[in-house]
Every structure is written in structure tokens, then in C-alpha cells.
A protein has these predicted regions:
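PLP-dependent class I/II
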Residues: 2-4, 8-14, 19-32, 38-56, ...
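Basic nucleic-acid-binding alpha-helical/helix-turn surface characteristic of O6-alkylguanine DNA
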Residues: 59
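Conserved N-terminal alpha-helix of the aminotransferase class I/II PLP-enzyme fold
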Residues: 63-96
Length: 401
């Protein structure tokens, strides 16, 4: 038979989803699995969004405009003003999730062989989107001991060469929960200006900042307006992962023109998803407050529990709803598989994402996992008990000297 493409062979497996068949099999055996592996919010979608879905009364489900409905884009402009992000409807392109926004940013701005600098650990799908676009990810290391803070400028400049085309950040960060400071954002701005790079900024977790520190959007950085592409999504903000609605936002008209060609090729973003997303913008302030308060409590529950567990260390995440934790294990991939295939405590086990899948540096993250705190607190507490029992029983446990 014909061979599979090099692109297909190079495409990485998702560290978040690759163990899913093992979880299905564990459940088939009657094991309860606590899903800490995926950022699927469990909190309710805004009632106004659900009501809009129920009230759809159409005789035809047509293509929507390739750029997305104007009424939705106009309403988004008002939403972003709350964060001091001033854009016009024409600056916004509605996409099939934030993922499509990232992919089209890469496709529109990068040539095959171009390089993107990304702090690691990084959201694993960035690597997949870069491969799809023929580009290459060049990672700059951050460390768990320093809370995954951004390295100094010199470390970036060591990676910059004639092929470097862009810097990609996620702020607040997935998978680490790190929040970039004003100094770090200014550092990135200066690099973008000095080397005339693109800045792709994934800001889908902006609503979840827990430290009292200010939210610094890439759109706030002066002097690089035409270099900046903002990625957004309703998935995490409204617990609407399934409607697949995101946005690509840029003041650069040439980028928008290029992106629109890809949008026209895929015809239209989801019609029904846009109806729900537009209605969800009417969610009351109490909705955002209640969701935020719940994640604050979950973060405390998880991080306190992890750091009380012998041999485990987690920095305190400043945003999003993830943390990367270091475990006393020889290999977190093996450990996560073992938890699903061979272990249970009183008929229960845990599912986590091996952090090595969020790194491109060989061997990095080998003893780390990403944990999403998207379970109710009593389930998080129970999952921590099960995790501790798993670590006690794991044959590959490694004790620090």
C-alpha cells in the first residue's frame, strides 16, 4: 500500500488523550477513574447560552459568513473592552475553536522551515499545528524550581537566527498555570520589535488569574500592534468546549486577508456554536464570579494536597486551571499507564497527562505530570488520596537523596 506521509508520521500523539483507551478499559473492568488529565470544565455553561440553544427555531441551518457573524463580532468588541482590549469587528475572525485560530495564524504567517520560539513546557497541540504548517518549534526551557518563569532575554537571543519568524506564548499558561509579569511581557515586546517577529498570544484563560496581579495582554503592548495575533476561545470561559468557537484577533490587515483565504476554504465556522457563544456574552457578573471562586477553592485544595504528599512538589499556579507537578517516579508516562492498567485503590484510580508530552527536549518532564483541577472539591480530595496510594505502591518509585 502507499506510504503514510512524513507529516503524518511526525505528528505527535496528544499526551492528554493518548491514554484514553486505557481509561475506557479500566472503566469496563468496573474501576472509577478520576479524570485529572484534560481541561474539560465541569462547571455549568451559562444558562443564557443553553437557552439560546434550546430556542433555535430554524427551517434551514445555512453556512455562516466565513469571518463569522457580524453581530457576534460586534458583541465581542464590547466584551474585550472590559479587559482594555480595543478592537473593531473587522479585527476579529471567528474560528472553529482556538485550535483553528492557532493553525491559521501559523499557516498565514509562516513559511515551511520557519521557526517559532515557544517556552516549554507548552500546550502540546502547538507542536502539531507547527508540523501541519511546515514550521518548526524551537523551545526555550523553563524550570519547575523557578515556577516556570520566563528565561532571560539572552536565552531567547541564543535561539534567534535567520529562520526565526515568531514567538508563541500562552498567558495564563497551559500547562503550568504561570502568569507572565509586566516585565516579562515587555521583554517579549522588545524582542519582537528588535527582530521584527510575529507574536502569537493564546489568552483563553484570562478570566482565571488568582494572584491579584494585572492581566497583561499582548494587545496592550505598544509598538507591535501589527506583529501581534491574539488567540481566544469560549471553551474554558463558558464551559463550551463542544461548540468549537474561537477567535483570531489582529490589527494587521495583511494577516487577516491571508487568514480569510483559509477560512473561505473551510467555508464557515459553526453556525449553532456562534448562536450559543453570542448569547453567552449576556451571562451575568455572578456567573463569572461563581466560576472564578470555585476554581480558587479547587486550586487551594489540589496544591495543598499535592505538596502534603511525600515526594511530590507543585508550584502554586497563578492562573488557568492546571498545574505541573513533580512526582517521585522513574517515568511519569509509565506511571500514568500503570495507574490505569494495573492499579486501583478501593476500586478507584487517577488519570493524568504525562508532562513529557508538553516538552520537545528529550528527557524533559520525565518525572512530571499535568493535572487539571476540573473536578468538584470532594472528588479532588479523593483523587489525591488515590494518587498518594498509587505513589506508595508504584514499583518505579524514586526516593530523593
Amino acid at each position: 500500500m502507499p506510504e503514510i506521509s512524513v507529516r503524518g508520521l511526525e505528528m505527535p500523539e496528544s499526551p492528554i488523550r493518548k491514554l484514553a483507551p486505557l481509561a475506557v478499559e479500566a472503566k469496563r473492568r468496573g474501576i472509577k477513574v478520576y479524570h485529572l488529565n484534560i481541561g474539560q470544565p465541569d462547571l455549568p455553561t451559562p444558562q443564557c447560552g443553553l437557552d439560546a440553544l434550546k430556542k433555535i427555531d430554524r427551517t434551514l441551518l445555512e453556512y455562516s459568513p466565513s469571518q463569522g457573524y457580524l453581530s457576534y463580532r460586534e458583541k465581542l468588541c464590547d466584551f474585550y473592552k472590559k479587559f482594555n482590549i480595543n478592537v473593531k469587528p473587522d479585527d476579529i475572525i471567528i474560528t472553529a475553536g482556538g485550535s483553528e485560530a492557532v493553525l491559521y495564524s501559523f499557516m498565514a504567517c509562516l513559511n515551511p522551515g520557519d521557526e517559532i520560539i515557544v517556552p516549554e513546557p507548552a500546550y502540546a497541540n502547538y507542536m502539531a499545528f507547527a508540523i501541519s504548517a511546515g514550521a518548526k518549534i524551537k523551545t526555550i526551557a523553563t524550570s519547575i524550581e523557578e515556577g516556570f518563569a520566563l528565561p532571560k532575554v539572552e536565552k531567547f537571543e541564543e535561539l534567534i537566527n535567520e529562520k526565526t519568524r515568531a514567538i508563541m506564548i500562552c498567558n495564563p499558561n497551559n500547562p503550568t498555570g504561570y502568569l507572565y509579569t509586566r516585565r516579562e511581557m515587555n521583554q517579549i515586546r522588545d524582542l519582537v520589535k528588535k527582530y521584527d517577529l510575529y507574536l502569537f498570544s493564546d489568552e483563553v484563560y484570562r478570566e482565571y488569574i488568582y494572584t491579584g496581579s494585572p492581566y497583561i495582554s499582548a494587545m496592550h503592548l505598544q509598538g507591535i500592534e501589527n506583529n501581534t495575533v491574539l488567540i481566544d476561545s469560549v471553551s474554558k470561559r463558558y464551559s463550551e468546549c463542544g461548540i468549537r468557537i474561537g477567535a483570531l484577533i489582529t490589527k494587521n490587515e495583511e494577516i487577516r486577508k491571508a487568514v480569510m483565504k483559509f477560512c473561505q476554504a473551510r467555508l464557515s465556522p459553526p453556525l449553532i456554536g456562534q448562536i450559543v457563544a453570542e448569547a453567552s456574552l449576556d451571562a451575568p457578573a455572578s456567573y463569572y464570579r461563581d466560576v472564578y471562586d470555585e476554581y480558587v477553592e479547587r486550586r487551594k485544595c489540589l496544591i495543598d494536597g499535592l505538596n502534603r504528599t511525600p515526594g511530590v512538589y507543585s508550584p502554586i499556579p497563578m492562573g488557568a486551571f492546571y498545574t505541573v507537578a513533580k512526582l517521585p517516579v522513574d517515568d511519569s508516562d509509565k506511571f500514568c499507564r500503570w495507574c490505569l492498567e494495573e492499579f486501583n485503590y478501593e476500586g478507584e484510580t487517577v488519570m493524568m497527562a504525562p508532562a513529557s508530552g508538553f516538552y520537545t527536549t528529550p528527557g524533559a518532564g520525565r518525572n512530571q505530570v499535568r493535572i487539571a483541577y476540573v473536578l468538584k472539591r470532594e472528588d479532588l480530595q479523593r483523587a489525591l488520596v488515590v494518587l498518594q496510594k498509587a505513589l506508595e505502591a508504584y514499583p518505579g518509585r524514586v526516593e530523593e537523596e
